[in-house]
Amino acid sequence: MSRLCLPASLSEEEVEALDRIVRRSRPLHKGDYLFRADDPMRQVFVLRSGALKSYLLDANGDEQVTGFVLPGEMLGLDAIGETRFCGYAVALETSLACAMDLEQLEDLSGRIPGLRHQLLHILSRGIHGEHEHIRRSRERAEQRLASFLLGLSMRYRQRGLSPDRFTLPMTRGEIGNYLDLTVETVSRLFTRYIQAGLIECHGREVRLLDRSGLCRMGGLEEHQEASTSRR
């Protein structure tokens, strides 16, 4: 299980040590919470299958989507140093996560350099993704959505899945919330991309037809796609 939950160059002995602290959580159905704000911060999680949405609530109780979690991705590390989670993680579809006790993981990472390096890499990538998201919030709407689709494509590729044909687990409203766009704007942009021959859509299934065109739309060179890949 640890090979999926926390990819790292570990020896067989180290993998076995990690496996001993990994446990599979109960299956989550659409709408079930993996954790909520103010839940005790005792574990970190890695999604094994399905998809999750992370979000915060503002002062008015309105939802602000902060990211989408795909299989093989970790969540909860950003709350390290806190005693409670500050946000929510909810299943967008039937999902399964594995959990690791935080104290045991910290102890193990102190004894396994490769594991410690991987955890630091995940934290660094998350911070970079947040900065990139803030930077892109100032861009035009068509750039934001193009970058979002390319980022999803890269994340699917990194997990050995098709980067050119995938199903969106989130609604267009949730995409709009994340990108700070109205659902009408998101729908209009999808129509524009389809008419331009950039993508093809059947329900929530998306097929990327012209990656170079999407990169131009997003203001990216093709080799820059990786910078859009973090949630």
Predicted regions and their residues:
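Cyclic-nucleotide recognition modules
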Residues: 67-128
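Polybasic "coupling" helices that flank or enter modular domains
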Residues: 110-182
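Cyclic nucleotide-binding regulatory module and flanking cytosolic helices
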Residues: 1-30, 74-75, 79-82
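Cyclic nucleotide-binding regulatory domains
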Residues: 6, 32-94
